[in-house]
């Protein structure tokens, strides 16, 4: 397995797909990286030379990926919580942040249902 940005990328997949295993790199960013590194998208990772891997690594270093990106996202969320912004309050309460309806849905953010027992008469 080739190691790029601290992530083992799969050997048997095409390079453009393998790069998406890095946090912060999607398909379009992977294509951009390969264009800068002058490497074909259809090449398999196992067929890459050390020189090509080096060019890909240097192209990836220009982007904010993995630990730096995760840290930036978490700091942004902490900042929203500290300043008391509406989005920060939604993060703190574990509710959807982007205005989604919460009457029936949003189970992913809320977690499993907590049923409330009926009051006895």
Curated annotation (Swiss-Prot):
Q: Name one GO molecular function term.
A: tRNA binding
Tell me a GO biological process for this protein: translation
A GO cellular component annotation here is:
small ribosomal subunit
Biased-composition ranges, Basic residues, are: 106-121
State if Phosphoprotein is listed as a keyword.
no
Q: Which keywords does this chain's UniProt record carry?
A: Ribonucleoprotein, Ribosomal protein, RNA-binding, rRNA-binding, tRNA-binding
Give the superkingdom in one word.
Answer: Bacteria
What ranges does the record give for the region Disordered, renumbered to this chain? 94-121
Gene3D superfamilies annotated for this entry? 1.10.8.50, 30s ribosomal protein s13, domain 2
Transmembrane feature ranges: none
Subunit organization? Part of the 30S ribosomal subunit. Forms a loose heterodimer with protein S19. Forms two bridges to the 50S subunit in the 70S ribosome.
Among PANTHER family, the record links this protein to: 30S RIBOSOMAL PROTEIN S13/40S RIBOSOMAL PROTEIN S18 (PTHR10871), SMALL RIBOSOMAL SUBUNIT PROTEIN US13M (PTHR10871:SF1)
- NCBIfam families assigned: uS13_bact
The free-text function statement in the UniProt record for this protein reads: Located at the top of the head of the 30S subunit, it contacts several helices of the 16S rRNA. In the 70S ribosome it contacts the 23S rRNA (bridge B1a) and protein L5 of the 50S subunit (bridge B1b), connecting the 2 subunits; these bridges are implicated in subunit movement. Contacts the tRNAs in the A and P-sites.
Please give the family membership noted in the entry.
Belongs to the universal ribosomal protein uS13 family.
The protein, known as: Small ribosomal subunit protein uS13
According to its UniProt entry, this protein's organism is Halalkalibacterium halodurans (strain ATCC BAA-125 / DSM 18197 / FERM 7344 / JCM 9153 / C-125) (Bacillus halodurans)
